A protein has these predicted regions:
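Domain-scale, conserved, charged regions that form catalytic cores
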Residues: 1-207, 214-216
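Catalytic cores of nucleophile-dependent amide-cleaving enzymes
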Residues: 123-147, 155-157, 203-292
């Protein structure tokens, strides 16, 4: 596995790319590049605009891909140093961990374009975020011999597609019933049910609505039949018991006025929910950026 560490220092980025086994080395090379973060912010906004054109079906096919590659190429050119670019392009390793400061989470690193492909298509890519928040060491869960998976689908009973998604996942895993135990719950899912059963499972898949509270972000969370399963609820649970190893949250910020569109600050909104799970002991979090 490759690890790309990137630190923000004023108007520059300092970075180092190394194999995970090299963590114990006494010395490690790093390189630095000056960055105009005003320009980077504009490019990030352009990425969101392009993705929203897909959702609104304004632009499709090759025109959109061409525009996205241009923006991705500019991000690649302006964010990474030459040594890092060269090693990424020549590496035969397929797994890449991106370790970044939380100030850099709004950048769509996965869409950096190296001239031939996007970073997320070249690597199995994951993020590790460094935070200034003081956190206690969470209780990490070990995988059971036969992992248990909970599917929570359409808890508010107004998303047929979320229900069908849950059914499809259950049916797919049904073929492997000797290897993984699946429980499926749909409609009328309340907060008490989730709090009681969430920590019994190794994997949780949620398909439904999520609401973001800009005034009190700790109240943001999954929308259930009787309210939100919030960031605060997650943090409270994580202080007493081990949470699932993997949470797949196929939910995004519900907005009736502009359904299907992506907010300019979508990375930050997703980070609030993701960080709550990760701080509480969830090892892996997958989340959607598109409104549902």
């Amino acid at each position: 596995t490759l690890v790309l560490e990137i630190f923000r220092q004023d108007h520059a980025l300092k970075m180092s790319l190394f194999e995970q086994g090299e963590l114990a080395l006494t010395l490690r090379h790093y390189s630095q590049t000056s960055v105009s973060f005003i320009e980077i912010d504009k490019l990030c906004q352009e990425v969101v605009s392009l993705l929203n054109k897909v959702n609104k079906k304004i632009t499709a096919g090759q025109d959109l891909i061409a525009s996205l590659t241009k923006v991705g190429q500019l991000l690649w050119d302006n964010l990474l140093t030459r040594p890092v670019k060269n090693r990424l392009k020549s590496s035969s390793i397929l797994d890449l961990i991106l370790s970044i400061d939380e100030e850099l989470i709004n950048i769509p690193w996965e869409l950096l374009y190296d001239g031939t492909s996007f970073l997320a298509l070249n690597f199995n890519l994951g993020r590790v975020v460094r935070t200034k928040e003081e956190i206690s060491l969470p209780q990490y869960r070990s995988f059971s011999p036969t992992p248990k998976m909970l599917i929570l689908a359409n808890p508010t009973n107004d998303l047929k597609s979320a229900y069908l998604e849950g059914i499809n996942i259950r049916n797919q895993f049904d073929r492997k019933r000797n290897n993984v135990h699946i429980d499926f719950k749909s409609t009328s899912i309340d907060k008490l049910y989730v709090k009681k059963h969430f920590c019994e499972y190794d994997i949780v898949h949620f398909a439904g609505h999520c609401e973001y509270d800009p005034v009190s972000p700790e109240n943001s969370g999954w929308v259930l039949s009787d309210g939100r399963f919030s960031v605060e609820d997650i943090l409270n649970m994580g202080s007493t018991i081990s949470l699932p190893i993997l949470v797949f949250s196929n939910a995004c910020h519900w907005a009736k006025a502009t359904p299907g569109l992506i907010d300019l600050d979508y990375q930050q909104k997703n980070y609030n929910l993701a960080s709550a799970f990760l701080f509480s002991g969830v090892r892996h979090y997958l989340g959607a950026i598109r409104r549902i």
